[in-house]
Amino acid sequence: AWWDRLSPLAQPWQPAPLVIPASDFLPPAERRRAGQAIRLALGCGYQAVADSGLEAGGIASVFASTDVDAENTHRICLALNEAEPTLSPTRFHNSVQNAVSGYWTIVTGSHAPTTMVMGGDDIFAIGLLEAMAQAAQAAGPVLLVVFDVVMPEPLFSVHPIEGGGAVAWTGSRGAPEDHGRPEGVGAGVDGCEHRDAAARD
């Protein structure tokens, strides 16, 4: 049953070093420019799509995060505090909220809709609601990726995220006989674990 595949989520949380998924699928230029948070989100999303057997370039996507790339935000703040502020173009283009969506469309060649949402401590629920709303209206599947990394100080004091991680899910509206129950398959990155978090019968 699908709920048996969610059993790892019921285990007590254990801190572990965050392992970023391999980013071989990224073109060299994007691999150099993408920060840790973006590589984490893309890697987890790419794993979920590969596990689902879907074509990454043909599905809508929703990315959800508390702060997207906190390290990049921190570096920009430090640069702006200098006597003569200088800001690299890479830092600037990675600072926009939907940077990860942009990287995703570059990597996959997707012309499908892509959305980036932010929502503080409620981000998982907000991302899931957005993905389910899109799945209910769309003719095809939707990818949801929820991700966060640990913020550096002083941002950590404002919003302490104890550990980074990501979870991704692909799903679509169920058939009428399933009463609209969503079907999906997913992948999680929590420390050095990769686990299947599918919600399928």
Say what each PLM segment does.
Residues 1-116, 146-201:
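Conserved "HGTGT" condensation-loop signature of ketosynthase/thiolase-family condensing enzymes
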Residues 41-46, 51-53, 116-142:
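Active-site-proximal alpha-helical scaffold in enzymes
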